[in-house]
Swiss-Prot record:
The keyword Lipid biosynthesis does not apply. Residues 1-18 form the signal peptide. It is an enzyme of class 3 (hydrolase). Glycans are attached at residue 108. This is Glandular kallikrein-7, submandibular/renal. The gene is Klk7. Glandular kallikreins cleave Met-Lys and Arg-Ser bonds in kininogen to release Lys-bradykinin. Predominant kallikrein protein in the kidney.
Length: 261
């Protein structure tokens, strides 16, 4: 099912029960502090919603299915509950979901054979640019196609358990591999298109899942994907996860940024 919305209440330090279909890091480890300075924590009002990626001091990219009526972002966070020296809070002035994304598929909370969840991408324009520091940095968009077999790293604050919701305070990283799309085509009844990347471990045990939606997938150190959807429970054998393939969207991203300075 879709990696939908995880709500974490910072004021109470509690996590609400998560609906089925969310995304989490499984089989990962605590990221080294400030090792992912482009990682964004996206909030709906005061509740944690999704991950995101800082691609420009004024722009964050995330998944289109991370929809809300109110966006706020935290930058430079490693632990979501601690006061941290590099942490920066920003409001979002505008959101730009990809025009070809089909939001009604997400709202239905169902998955049907042949459903096409392509174009799961959204740009967020910050009301004030981020301050670039040792703990907050932008990451470049890809300029070349990723290679099958590449070593990839995904990160997020999603659940570390595939069925029992257990959400970490600290940012988690997981090392996985980029697979051919044919592996995901065999795994899913939904469409797997050339606008998507297939990544994970066929033996299972390592995956992104609830709460990781919208976060980064770096392959050979290059930002190549945005966490989108996958199996439930996550990290199942022969069921890698799906990521939005950024190289297919660089022209659209640059156009939106240029037209909305």
């Amino acid at each position: 099912m879709w990696f939908l919305i995880l709500f974490l209440d910072l004021s109470l330090g509690q996590i609400d029960a998560a609906p089925p279909g969310q995304s989490r890091v499984i089989g990962g480890y605590k990221c080294e502090k400030n090792s992912q300075p482009w990682q964004v924590a996206l909030y709906s009002f005061t509740k944690y919603l999704c991950g995101g990626v800082l691609i420009d001091p004024s722009w964050v990219i995330t998944a289109a299915h991370c929809s809300s009526n109110n966006y706020q972002v935290w930058l430079g966070r490693n632990n979501l509950l601690e006061d941290e020296p590099f942490a920066q809070h920003r409001l979002v002035s505008q959101s730009f979901p990809h025009p070809d994304y089909k939001p009604f598929l997400m709202r239905n909370h169902t998955r049907k054979p042949g459903d096409d969840h392509s174009n799961d991408l959204m740009l967020l324009h910050l009301s004030q640019p981020a301050d670039i520091t040792d703990g907050v940095k932008v990451i470049d968009l890809p300029t070349e196609e990723p290679k099958v077999g590449s070593t990839c790293l995904a990160s997020g604050w999603g659940s570390t358990k595939p069925l029992i919701w257990e959400f970490p305070d600290d940012l988690q990283c997981v090392n996985i591999h980029l697979l051919s799309n044919e592996k995901c085509i065999k795994a899913y009844k939904e469409k797997v298109t050339d606008l998507m990347l297939c990544a994970g471990e066929l033996e299972g045990g390592k995956d992104t899942c609830t709460g990781d939606s919208g976060g980064p997938l770096l392959c050979d150190g290059v930002l190549q994907g945005i966490t989108s959807w996958g199996s439930v429970p996550c990290a199942k054998t022969n069921m890698p996860a799906i990521y939005t393939k950024l190289i297919k969207f660089t022209s659209w991203i640059k156009e939106v940024m240029k037209e909305n300075p």
